[in-house]
């Protein structure tokens, strides 16, 4: 449950004006749930307890936060932390599911044999399966409600000289532009930037879509911008140079040896290549953006030591570039894959930072979309039911009461996390009246609740038909989903030797994949490409970390190896051409060992010597 609610606005009058603007925006866009989002914003930002889980490098103000945008902003606001530049790359409402390719690592014994034979494995030979990261499937109303609440939260933690870049594409950008005008003010709209690239669709029936859109807004008229940091080099002829000289946008570079190179003020159309498969910056994250894109934004719109924030951090490109350019950073994301990818990326870059977890009551199973899938399998008897609306996750059959509709909050939509008067009113006055008359009971799962007695009193006073509403805590189900991986090891001299590693969750996933492959073989024929895991299971390990500082509390990675998909290791942030040999060395006595499996689950074990 939230510790308290932090007001979005210092001045209630200003806050009400913004909300009144939102009412007008809703009327223009003609979509629903106006009162719902208005009441949530009037209530304030939900502030939860936080836990620092790891410190990397020296003591630093840099943060990696696992949690939702709104909850992260509540933490920043409560601690008087203001950000000077925001870049966000939120879901585009594209209707697509995004997946992570999970590669089975090489068994150390096999990898060593390959090394001795001086052979190389091609990437195509690697065995892998996919896991969902998140679903970008929204209806327009839900997306805009969610986006409005996030943008209001972000604005509340921006400094007076801050600006924000929001990265979108053709699916929803025209609607979000109207929200941005209302939240930040039409007068604070600065640019519509076109990022043009060659990657993408190849069709002949219409113009090919080859760009994304970035909207730039400022918090006030006193925003920071330095065009000299991002001047563009262009070649021009001597005759043109003499004719233009200091006129227009051209700025002559007087340094010797430049030849016909000139520098020009940047425009709002950017030709920046997407990341190719062999790029050194590539981190195998499906929505990764190029560092060159963020470099241009951060150089122009911030100065050294300013705080750069990305509340949908993804691959960690914003934090990485901010650190490279001498800025402070805040990276926030709800998915464990984002947190781990960014953490590893920044460690390789030599950055110092804290990793924090927002304790919002949800013990996520890797990420929201996988948690939703897991929940459906854990609610006994839950199945899809055509006779109930999509508000309900489905229904269960009760031997006495018959069909019982079940509501489950959508973990990908933060507005459904809290069971409050707004949500239960929606259940009573919108969802229940649409149910068939023979329905006698509904089940409402919740993650967080304002006050159970208050909710039950509201139900008694407002429920207009004879139907039972049962409230259930979703956390009781989620607590059953986490099963620690099993590790066996022994210590010899200054090395820990991994004997075996068992991850029931991954084994189950691999078995599901193999069954799918067998089914395809029956239908299509051909060779069955099943995944087999050795008895030791070492190929299921992605990273090993030793804490030689403390046996509890905040993690300190004193020794660390990460195994890439080809079997090579990165040792304490430094890439090598060595295969993993099934061991990890230490200098100081290790107190704890952390193992990350190839799907991103981490388990910590106390070392007994």
What kind of region is each of these model predictions?
Residues 156-158, 167, 183, 301:
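Conserved helix-to-beta-strand junction in the class I
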Residues 45-66, 79, 85-90, 94-102, ...:
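Nucleic acid-processing catalytic cores of prokaryotic defense/repair systems
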């Amino acid at each position: 449950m939230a510790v308290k609610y932090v007001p979005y606005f210092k001045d209630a009058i200003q806050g009400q004006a913004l909300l009144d603007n939102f009412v007008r925006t809703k009327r223009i866009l003609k979509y629903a749930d106006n009162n719902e989002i208005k009441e949530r914003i009037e209530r304030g930002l939900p502030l939860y307890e936080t836990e620092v889980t790891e410190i990397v490098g020296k003591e630093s103000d840099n943060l990696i936060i696992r949690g939702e945008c709104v909850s992260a902003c509540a933490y920043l606001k409560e601690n008087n932390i203001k950000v000077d530049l925001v870049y966000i790359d939120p879901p585009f409402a594209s209707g697509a599911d995004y997946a992570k390719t999970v590669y089975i690592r090489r068994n150390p014994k096999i990898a060593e044999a390959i090394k001795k034979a001086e052979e190389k494995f091609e990437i195509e030979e690697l065995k892998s399966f996919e896991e969902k990261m998140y679903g970008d499937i929204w209806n327009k109303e839900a997306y805009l409600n969610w986006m409005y609440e996030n943008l209001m939260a972000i604005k509340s933690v921006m400094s007076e000289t801050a600006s924000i870049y929001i990265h979108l594409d053709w699916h929803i950008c025209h609607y979000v532009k109207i929200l941005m005008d209302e939240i930040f003010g039409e007068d604070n709209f600065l640019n519509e930037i076109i990022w043009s690239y060659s990657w993408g669709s190849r069709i002949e029936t219409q113009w090919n879509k080859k760009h994304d859109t970035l909207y730039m807004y400022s918090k006030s008229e006193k925003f920071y911008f330095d065009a000299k940091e991002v001047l563009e080099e262009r070649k021009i002829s001597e005759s043109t140079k003499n004719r233009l000289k200091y006129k227009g946008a051209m700025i002559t570079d007087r340094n010797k040896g430049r030849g016909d190179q000139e520098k020009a003020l940047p425009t709002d159309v950017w030709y920046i290549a997407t990341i190719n498969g062999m790029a050194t910056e590539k981190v195998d994250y499906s929505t990764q953006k190029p560092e060159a894109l963020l470099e241009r934004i951060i150089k122009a719109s911030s100065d050294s030591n300013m705080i750069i924030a990305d509340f949908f951090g993804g691959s960690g490109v914003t934090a990485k570039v901010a650190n490279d350019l001498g800025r402070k950073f805040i990276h926030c994301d709800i998915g464990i894959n984002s947190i781990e990818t960014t953490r590893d990326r920044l460690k390789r870059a030599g950055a110092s930072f804290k990793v924090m977890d927002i304790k919002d009551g949800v013990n996520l199973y890797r990420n929201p979309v996988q948690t939703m899938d897991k929940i459906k399998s854990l609610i006994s008897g839950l199945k899809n039911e055509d006779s109930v609306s999509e508000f309900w996750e489905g229904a269960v059959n009760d031997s006495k009461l018959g069909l019982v509709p079940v509501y489950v909050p959508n973990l990908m939509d933060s507005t459904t996390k809290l069971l409050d008067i707004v949500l239960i009113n929606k259940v009573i006055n919108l969802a229940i009246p649409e149910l068939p008359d023979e329905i006698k009971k509904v089940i409402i799962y919740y993650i967080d609740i304002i006050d159970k007695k208050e909710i039950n009193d509201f139900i008694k006073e407002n429920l207009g038909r004879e139907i039972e509403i049962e409230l259930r805590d979703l956390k009781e189900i989620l607590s059953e989903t986490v099963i620690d991986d099993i590790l066996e090891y022994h210590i010899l001299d200054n090395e820990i030797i991994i004997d075996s590693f068992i991850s029931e969750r991954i084994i189950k996933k691999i078995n599901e994949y193999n069954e799918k492959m067998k089914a395809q073989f029956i239908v299509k024929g051909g060779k069955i490409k099943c995944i087999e895991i050795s008895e030791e299971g070492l190929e299921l390990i992605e990273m090993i970390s030793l804490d030689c500082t403390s046996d509890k509390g905040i993690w300190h990675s004193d020794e660390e190896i990460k195994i890439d998909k080809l079997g090579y290791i990165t040792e304490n942030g430094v890439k090598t051409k060595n295969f993993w040999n099934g061991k990890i060395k230490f200098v100081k006595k290790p107190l704890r060992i952390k193992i990350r499996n190839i799907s991103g689950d981490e388990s910590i074990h106390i070392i007994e010597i």
